[in-house]
Amino acid sequence: MEGLEAYDYHLPPEQIAQEGVEPRDMARLMVVYREGPFRVAHKRVRDLPEFLRPGDVLVFNESKVIPARLLARKPTGGKVEILLVRERSPGLWEALLGPARKAPPGTRLLLLSPKDLAPVPGLQAEVVAVEEDGVRLLRFQGDLVAHLEEVGEVPLPPYIKAKIPMERYQTVYARRPGSVAAPTAGLHFTPELLERLREMGVELRFLTLHVGPGTFRPVKGDPEKHEMHAEPYAIPEEVAEAVNRAKAEGRRVVAVGTTVVRALESAYREGVGVVAGEGETRLFIRPPYTFKVVDALFTNFHLPRSTLLMLVAAFLGRERTLEAYRLAVAEGYRFYSLGDAMLIL
């Protein structure tokens, strides 16, 4: 296993996308092949049907981003920013706080409206415990879920400086609230493109993996020692059956995004295939991982030294991945969450 510097590349800051392309499927698409000599095709996302075939199973993550960034004030007047991680039980949330050191157990927090920073009547929280990695357990008084749209904001990645509307950071098929960041590969799909794929005989299937704040967490030091945050996933029975049937019949399983890869690979059992149901994954995919389920991957261009880039390197090969990234930089592709896409076949 190589060190962190083996997953580095140079990216001019102006190639970090600050907004999405409209229409969504007009984003550029680099098609890269895993086998044979290095070759690519430069296309648009709307050209995707050219590279898929009837019987392919295209798997999406239908998790929906929640407005997970909250502002609060302590009774002493100090401001606190809350990033919701997930609801453990009704009214009890795992969260990251900043500045965290000033919020020990027993700290009471008044939630503020992001519009005028006035306290929201009847909505407050108490820090009840501090867990590993600095995660706080917060007990909310009042119905937080009912007020989330009113008091919460989209927790955009730190490299996006512009304010973007919530719907632009949401896939068109998002249905199950729970992610604190978008499963960004899916942002490229339009209802029209999905319909074209359906009509040509591609099977569209949907699972859920709620993206946690660990997606923003950089790898520091030795990748071997990096620990992933647990993320919950759910794979419906009919999706597991469709994937297993495709594998048995020699048809391709195409993952839309790294979250789908991690959910499917986590749910795989030797001799059984993908097992339906709910679970949690801390799976960190990096070379020399052997893929059991996924045959092709549609994904964005990821940050240097990130777990996502390592996953792509495991799938495509590290040298070939970095060669493709260098070419993408030279060709002016747009990078990260709102940027262009890559299809690995």
From Swiss-Prot:
Signal peptide: none annotated. One of its GO terms (molecular function) is S-adenosylmethionine:tRNA ribosyltransferase-isomerase activity. It catalyses: 7-aminomethyl-7-carbaguanosine(34) in tRNA + S-adenosyl-L-methionine = epoxyqueuosine(34) in tRNA + adenine + L-methionine + 2 H(+). GO terms for cellular component: cytoplasm. Its EC number is 2.4.99.17. It comes from the Bacteria. It is found in: Cytoplasm. Keywords: Cytoplasm, Queuosine biosynthesis, S-adenosyl-L-methionine, Transferase. Its main location: cytoplasm. It is an enzyme of class 2 (transferase). InterPro entries: QueA, QueA_dom1, QueA_dom2, QueA_sf. GO terms for biological process: queuosine biosynthetic process; tRNA wobble guanine modification. HAMAP family: QueA. Belongs to the QueA family. Transfers and isomerizes the ribose moiety from AdoMet to the 7-aminomethyl group of 7-deazaguanine (preQ1-tRNA) to give epoxyqueuosine (oQ-tRNA). Monomer. This is S-adenosylmethionine:tRNA ribosyltransferase-isomerase. It comes from Thermus thermophilus (strain ATCC BAA-163 / DSM 7039 / HB27).
